[in-house]
Amino acid sequence: FILLPLSDAGLPKDVEEKKQIINTIYDKALSLGMAHEDIVVDGLVATIGANPKAAIECYETIAYCKDEKKLPTICGLSNISFGLPERMYVNTAFLTMAICKGLTMAIANPSQELLMNAAFASDMLLDRPDSDIAYIERMSRLAEEKAQYETVVVKKSDNDASASNGTC
């Protein structure tokens, strides 16, 4: 299950309170029969526009879960950039830094090429198993797709030019 570090009082005020909430909910989950392996902690990232320390607090939470609790983590990437222009750059930078801190999963748009490429590159730079091959395969596939697209566009342009000259 996804452990959301929230209490009846609402959002935690700081990282220490967030850790206390994580511990309380974690202990309760175990007492109810949940297995450690079934628990994933949400980093609970806020928008940087409302809280300038939002990213840092999320990184600290992720590191705590990884290093102290040995728990996987997840977070919604786009929360960090809410209300900002050119959000994909903020989201991508946030993702790469969160991966470095131990982020296991992200709620993200997989069609955002920059974001996905950064995730593959981050895994490779952290020497995660088989990440080098995964990165190379991804880049090769993207290069092939780009070449196919460019071929289709060129052929379409050639056909359009001959049609406008009155030839078939």
Which residues does each PLM region occupy?
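ATP-dependent carboxylate/acyl-activation modules
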Residues: 1-38, 46-74, 78-168
